[in-house]
From Swiss-Prot:
GO terms for cellular component: cytoplasm. This is Trigger factor. The keyword Ligase does not apply. It comes from Bradyrhizobium sp. (strain ORS 278). Its EC number is 5.2.1.8. The gene is tig.
Length: 451
């Protein structure tokens, strides 16, 4: 076998490999000998079929299998010997001229093919013991608890019909009938009757509720939306749809009195018990916000201390995912780049920078996890699936079946678990100090696109 490196340019490498016909023929013959004991051919006793006869019948298909296996084995050997870690799948280019292909399959000509790869760069990890990370912590006040209870009361408020001819406004509950289509064709789950939609609740597809503002009872509108790219149903994810929607009733919200009686409607003994419950719930939210702040600060530190050229193909892939999402969101909302005080070119440049950061951080976290033998167990993934199912009451079986039959979706659940375990590992080594902050500071809306 002859291996010639024809390109070595940064992270890109290409090789031309030539495998002698005799080597391929010997491997194919070995497969045919093994096949002799497995096939049944009329006129021959089991195991007594001559290899030459088998070659006439199965020669080409066995040689094709042999070539495929040889290419995979050879590529693996080449990459391993050079210490390459692949960023993407190898791109193999085979002979295409029919006469040459026939000779190779007949074992009469050497196999010459090329393979192009992009590799992961060598990464020198920083000393995490030198990292200083601030941990913002906020106290929960009585006012925070009262505000949370008010939000709960608003969510459980009753509604009363609006006057005849009144139009729907934000906060109103609109009862609708709708029929959804994609490219003019109805789809499963796209039809509903007597469905209550609270405008501004953000419980429906982005853009659906906003387009109900101003609708009157009996009025029909065509609502144009785009399903999120991470929508549970893969067949609908990222697709534009139209919903012919008719309002059959419009109701305005009524204020709810917060007292012991309100608490009892929620299954609690008193308002004091409700306050205890809300304080515990807020404690969880504050803890999660602190975690996100610490994680963001740590990722920023990793970004600062690990500057290297990431594989272009991985950056392109990450950029395309984000850009497709941006375009779908803009199409759904009807916004333009001018509305965001930018241009398409500037936006692309910004998102490509974010894509580069994400890819580099992903490679760094992977390197840390690999070197420190950090893994995600099947039990941890199962617990994540269960939590996801619990978050969608009434659809638990659908969620469970979706992940059980979709390895890619399961991998998407595994990735953040792995990332969090690596982050925890680094935080154990870093110098983490608490800092008291206000609730507003803890929950301030930072631009998190790059995280």
């Amino acid at each position: 076998m002859q291996v010639t490196e024809t390109l070595s340019e940064g992270l890109k490498h290409e090789f031309q490999i030539s495998v002698p016909a005799a080597d391929l023929d010997a491997k194919a013959d070995a497969k045919l000998v093994d096949l002799k004991d497995k096939v049944r051919i009329n006129g021959f006793r089991p195991g007594k079929v001559p290899v030459a006869h088998l070659k006439k019948i199965y020669g080409k298909s066995v040689m094709a299998e042999t070539i495929d296996q040889t290419i995979r084995d050879t590529n693996t050997q080449i990459f391993t010997e050079r210490g390459f870690r692949l960023a993407t799948e190898p791109k193999v280019t085979m002979p295409t001229e029919e006469a040459e292909v026939e000779k190779i399959l007949a074992g009469q000509s050497d196999l010459t093919y090329s393979v192009a790869i992009e590799v992961v760069p060598a990464i020198t990890l920083a000393d995490f013991k030198t990292f200083a990370v601030e941990k913002p912590v906020a106290d929960i006040t009585d006012a925070d608890v009262d505000e949370a209870i008010k939000r709960l009361a608003d969510a459980n408020r009753s509604y009363a019909a609006k006057a005849e001819g009144a139009k729907a406004a934000s906060g109103d509950r609109v009862k609708v009938n709708f029929k959804g289509t994609i490219d003019g064709v109805a789809f499963d789950g796209g039809t509903g009757e007597g469905i209550d939609v609270v405008i501004g609740s953000n419980t429906f597809i982005p853009g659906f509720e906003d387009q109900l503002v101003g609708i009157a009872v009996g009025e029909t509108r065509t609502l144009k939306v785009t399903f999120p790219t991470n929508y549970l149903n893969n067949e609908l994810a990222g697709k534009a749809a139209e919903f012919e929607t008719t309002a059959t009733a419009i109701e305005a919200p009524e204020d709810k009195v917060v007292d012991d009686e309100f608490a009892k409607t929620l299954g609690l003994e008193s308002l004091d018990k409700l306050k205890e419950l809300m304080r515990d719930r807020l404690a969880g939210e504050f803890t999660q916000a602190t975690r996100q702040r610490v994680k963001r600060a740590l990722l920023d530190r990793l970004d600062e201390t690990h500057k290297f050229d990431a594989p272009p193909s991985l950056i392109d892939e990450e950029f395309n995912l984000m850009w497709n999402s941006v375009q779908a969101e803009m199409k759904s909302s009807g916004k333009t780049f001018a509305d965001e005080n930018t241009t398409e070119d500037k936006a692309k440049e910004e998102y490509r920078t974010i894509a580069d950061r994400r890819v580099r951080l992903g490679l760094v976290l992977s390197e840390i996890g690999e070197k420190n033998k950090i893994t995600v167990t099947d039990d941890e993934v199962s617990r994540a699936v269960i939590e996801r199912a619990r978050s969608m009451p009434g659809r638990e079986k659908e969620v469970w079946d979706f992940y059980r039959s979709n390895p890619q979706a399961l991998a998407q659940l595994r990735a953040p678990i792995y990332e969090d375990k690596v982050v925890d590992f680094i935080l154990e080594l870093a110098n983490v100090t608490e800092k008291k902050v206000s609730k507003d500071e803890l929950f301030k809306d930072d631009d998190d696109k790059a995280a």
